[in-house]
């Protein structure tokens, strides 16, 4: 198949129901795929996508990040996009969370007891936690008044926290993720932050 097709867009409808950018492009596809495709007419093919869907609400997330009201409306979008849009998962799509933040230091204390470097970093945490983490107050969190939090992961890392009842830094086993700012890698770091007046 040695067909050099021009880049001029002159769509044609092929007998396979697909629209090709040009008759040459259709012939090249037929040659490469070793099938017979003939031109039905000039211009794009008419899609036979049925938009007759019920108003049932059963949200479906498409691969385009759009939440469709039900499987039928997603199927319609799939048909209109020539299969570009497909089913991703049941339920609404999650909003895309920002991922790029500046390095400015403008500390923000989150409701999870963690200090975030700036408002953008807190917004990312808020988005990724589906709104469970929000702003507690501007500025750094008071790590020393927070309760010890092991976190949901199953690692085993030796860490230290300040126990406000005993007034001392105590050892604990940290799971490796989650947790809060009352989590120090060394006893010395804990004592310097929480015990020195």
Curated annotation (Swiss-Prot):
Gene3D superfamilies: 3.30.60.30, Pancreatic trypsin inhibitor Kunitz domain (4.10.410.10). The record marks 154-155 as: Reactive bond 4. One of its GO terms (molecular function) is serine-type endopeptidase inhibitor activity. GO terms for biological process: cell differentiation. Residues 144-194 form the BPTI/Kunitz inhibitor domain. Keywords: Disulfide bond, Protease inhibitor, Repeat, Serine protease inhibitor. GO terms for cellular component: extracellular region. The record marks 7-8 as: Reactive bond 1. PANTHER family: FOLLISTATIN, ISOFORM A-RELATED (PTHR10913:SF45), FOLLISTATIN-RELATED (PTHR10913). Pfam families: Kazal_1, Kazal_2, Kunitz_BPTI. It comes from the Eukaryota. The record marks 103-104 as: Reactive bond 3. Residues 1-47, 48-95, 96-143 form the Kazal-like domain. Disulfide bonds join 1-31, 5-24, 13-45, 49-79, 53-72, 61-93, 97-127, 101-120, 109-141, 144-194, 153-177, 169-190. This is Four-domain proteases inhibitor. It comes from Melithaea caledonica. Inhibits trypsin, kallikrein, subtilisin Carlsberg, human leukocyte elastase, porcine pancreatic elastase and chymotrypsin. Two domains are for the inhibition of chymotrypsin. The record marks 55-56 as: Reactive bond 2. InterPro entries: Kazal_dom (IPR002350), Kazal_dom_sf (IPR036058), Kunitz_BPTI (IPR002223), Kunitz_BPTI_sf (IPR036880), Prot_Inhib_GrowthFact_Antg (IPR050653), Prtase_inh_Kunz-CS (IPR020901).
């Amino acid at each position: 198949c040695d067909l050099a097709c021009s880049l001029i867009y002159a769509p044609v409808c092929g007998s396979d129901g697909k629209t090709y950018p040009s008759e040459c492009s259709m012939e090249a596809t037929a040659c490469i795929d070793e099938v017979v495709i003939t031109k039905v007419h000039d211009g794009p093919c008419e899609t036979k996508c049925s938009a007759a869907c019920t108003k049932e609400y059963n949200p479906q997330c498409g691969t385009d990040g759009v939440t469709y009201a039900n499987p039928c409306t997603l199927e319609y979008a799939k048909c209109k996009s020539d299969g570009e849009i497909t089913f991703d998962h049941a339920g609404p799509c999650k909003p895309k969370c920002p991922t790029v933040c500046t390095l400015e230091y403008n500390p923000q204390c989150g409701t999870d007891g963690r200090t975030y470097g700036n408002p953008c970093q807190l917004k990312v945490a808020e988005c990724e936690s589906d709104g469970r983490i929000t702003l507690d107050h501007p500025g750094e969190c008071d790590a020393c008044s927070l309760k010890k939090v092991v976190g949901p992961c199953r690692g085993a890392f030796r860490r230290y926290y300040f126990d406000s009842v005993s007034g001392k830094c105590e050892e604990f086993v940290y799971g490796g993720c989650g947790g809060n700012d009352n989590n120090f890698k060394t006893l010395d770091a804990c004592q310097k932050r929480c015990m020195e007046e």
